[in-house]
Amino acid sequence: MSQASRALKAYRNALRATSVAFKNDVATLDAARNEIRTHMKSQEDPKGTNRSIDERLKLLDEVTVFLRHNIVQGRKVDEGKYRLNIHKDTELGDNDDIKKKKDGLSNGGFTGCCGGSGAKTT
């Protein structure tokens, strides 16, 4: 596949991913698409790292995967309640890694974020 056709495919996939991730949020959808469009039109690497075109396309593919799998929209329905737009591509973890690490959160009598208030325990 030529580099131009790979770039077009990556660009289209990124735009589709924004449609899924930011459905019904016109402002965020437009901002995300403008950002992608700006970077695609740019001849230079925006961070100045001199990445090759292949590396930039790989990065765009990774952004696309991240948008599809890790971004979930939430809409407030009641005070303190939100409805999440979980779709078929949303990555749903089982939290096994988090459960395993929870035992190691206490450190020297202090408990951190998920383990409590952060106050010293005796």
Curated annotation (Swiss-Prot):
Q: Which GO terms describe its biological process?
A: mitochondrial respiratory chain complex III assembly
Q: What is its main location?
A: mitochondrion
Read off the transit peptide span from the entry: 1-17
Annotated coiled-coil positions are none
Q: Which InterPro entries match?
A: Complex1_LYR_LYRM7 (IPR045298), MZM1/LYRM7 (IPR050435)
Q: Where in the cell is it found?
A: Mitochondrion matrix
Q: Which GO terms describe its molecular function?
A: protein folding chaperone
Going by the UniProt record, its keywords in alphabetical order are: Chaperone, Mitochondrion, Transit peptide
Task: Tell whether Mitochondrion is among the UniProt keywords.
Answer: yes
Biased composition of type Basic and acidic residues is found at 92-104
Task: State the similarity comment.
Answer: Belongs to the complex I LYR family. MZM1 subfamily.
Assembly and partners are described as: Interacts with RIP1.
What protein is this chain from? Mitochondrial zinc maintenance protein 1, mitochondrial
- Organism this protein belongs to: Komagataella phaffii (strain GS115 / ATCC 20864) (Yeast)
**Gene assigned in the entry:** MZM1
